[in-house]
Amino acid sequence: MLSPKRTRFRKQHRGRLKGISYRGNRICFGRYALQALEPTWITSRQIEAGRRAMTRNIRRGGKIWVRIFPDKPVTLRPTETRMGSGKGSPEYWVAVVKPGRILYEMSGVAENIARRAISIAASKMPIKTQFIISG
């Protein structure tokens, strides 16, 4: 699972998911990509599940780039705990994704194989996505 090696602060505010992604919205490394169409938090488990699904599907040959990184800690309170007494402890990490953001890129495979692999990865994501081709 992806997570930062160390952070400056243990806990973060939740923040808001306003607007569209101005950074990371173009294909940089590969030929095919999966692009987010909705705003959400994507957990490190979901990122890893999508990556594994794509890797298994393209087998040998082809290269995959993961373009998002979970750098935001999400805190949870213990179950059956009364309100108050501070914020909960960090439980997992999420990547903040806005519409237009590229999630995965791929190259070195035929388009039909890439389309199939990326659609399987898209089914692991909690949002609507689209398959795009560079050029």
Curated annotation (Swiss-Prot):
SS bond partners: none
GO biological process, alphabetically ordered: mitochondrial translation
GO cellular component: chloroplast; mitochondrial large ribosomal subunit
Xref: CDD domains: Ribosomal_L16_L10e
GO molecular function: rRNA binding; structural constituent of ribosome
UniProt xrefs under PROSITE patterns: RIBOSOMAL_L16_1 (PS00586), RIBOSOMAL_L16_2 (PS00701)
InterPro entries (alphabetical): Ribosomal_uL16, Ribosomal_uL16_bact-type, Ribosomal_uL16_CS, Ribosomal_uL16_dom, Ribosomal_uL16_sf
Keyword Ribonucleoprotein set for record: yes
Superkingdom field: Eukaryota
Compartments (UniProt record): Plastid, Chloroplast
Entry keyword rRNA-binding: no
Quaternary context: Part of the 50S ribosomal subunit.
Alphabetized PANTHER family for the sequence: 50S/60S RIBOSOMAL PROTEIN L16, LARGE RIBOSOMAL SUBUNIT PROTEIN UL16M
Family membership noted in the UniProt record: Belongs to the universal ribosomal protein uL16 family.
Record-given protein name: Large ribosomal subunit protein uL16c
